[in-house]
């Protein structure tokens, strides 16, 4: 029987680094963010849905989604956030389910990286849930450095996500990413060996 492990965390918690280590260890990982980017590409299902909802002002000069502008429009307004979630979640869920079902045919163990795994109620999809955990202050610092956000912008982004401390109770494994890369890699390799 196939074992499916959900990988989650928060913005700037280090999920991408963890995913890279898992892939380098020979495991397949479905990355929800990559799925979303494909769906938002010109002509994709999310592209069409967002264009119908918000109009052509969300496009750049090449007709692609202007992601910073789209993000600003959605995060600036709580009603837009709700509408965006409702609009996008069913399309994303369908595509993730399709990819999950395909991997079930070929893999004994695989991972699905979903940032909002708990919030969007994907829990029942998984045999285990691994949480990439980082302290809030470190998360803020990483987000400000990575995205060139002010502290206020970073705090606003974090305020729209479930705190990582609240996600701990859902996790089968907590990957502590407050240390260095070597320590992180050791934790992951140890967990993978126990599968």
Curated annotation (Swiss-Prot):
Primary role: Catalyzes the phosphorylation of the 3'-hydroxyl group of dephosphocoenzyme A to form coenzyme A.
Primary location: cytoplasm
Superkingdom as given in the UniProt entry: Bacteria
A molecular function GO annotation: ATP binding
Gene3D superfamilies documented for this protein: P-loop containing nucleotide triphosphate hydrolases
Alphabetical list of PANTHER family matching this protein: BIFUNCTIONAL COENZYME A SYNTHASE-RELATED, DEPHOSPHO-COA KINASE-RELATED
Single Gene Ontology BP annotation: coenzyme A biosynthetic process
Keyword Endoplasmic reticulum in record: no
HAMAP family, sorted: Dephospho_CoA_kinase
Keywords: ATP-binding, Coenzyme A biosynthesis, Cytoplasm, Kinase, Nucleotide-binding, Transferase
Protein name, UniProt field: Dephospho-CoA kinase
Class in the EC hierarchy, top level: transferase
Entry's localization field: Cytoplasm
Family to which the UniProt record says this protein belongs: Belongs to the CoaE family.
A Pfam family that the UniProt record links to this protein: CoaE
Catalytic activity as recorded in UniProt: 3'-dephospho-CoA + ATP = ADP + CoA + H(+)
InterPro entries, per database record: Depp_CoAkinase (IPR001977), P-loop_NTPase (IPR027417)
Domain DPCK: 4-195
Cellular component GO terms held in the UniProt record: cytoplasm
Keyword Transcription belongs to the record: no
EC number in record: 2.7.1.24
Organism expressing this protein natively: Streptococcus agalactiae serotype III (strain NEM316)
Pathway: Cofactor biosynthesis; coenzyme A biosynthesis; CoA from (R)-pantothenate: step 5/5
Binding site for ATP: 12-17
SUPFAM superfamilies xrefs: P-loop containing nucleoside triphosphate hydrolases (SSF52540)
């Amino acid at each position: 029987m196939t074992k499916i492990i959900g990988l989650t965390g928060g913005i700037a918690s280090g999920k991408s680094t963890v995913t890279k280590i898992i892939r380098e260890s020979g495991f397949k990982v479905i990355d929800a963010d990559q799925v979303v980017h494909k769906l938002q590409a010109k002509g994709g299902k999310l592209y069409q849905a967002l264009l119908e909802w918000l109009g052509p002002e969300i496009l750049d000069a090449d007709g692609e989604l202007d992601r910073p502008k789209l993000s600003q429009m959605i995060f600036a307004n709580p009603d837009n956030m709700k509408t965006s979630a409702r609009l996008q979640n069913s399309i994303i869920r369908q595509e993730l389910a399709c990819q999950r079902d395909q991997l079930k045919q070929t893999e004994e163990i695989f991972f699905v990286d979903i940032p909002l795994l708990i919030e969007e109620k994907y829990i029942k999809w998984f045999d285990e849930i691994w949480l990439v955990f980082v302290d809030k202050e470190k998360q803020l610092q990483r987000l400000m450095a990575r995205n060139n956000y002010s502290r206020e912008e970073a705090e606003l982004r974090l305020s729209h996500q479930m705190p990582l401390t609240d996600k701990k109770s859902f996790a089968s494994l907590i990957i502590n990413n407050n240390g260095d890369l070597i320590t992180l890699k050791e934790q992951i390799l140890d967990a993978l060996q126990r599968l």
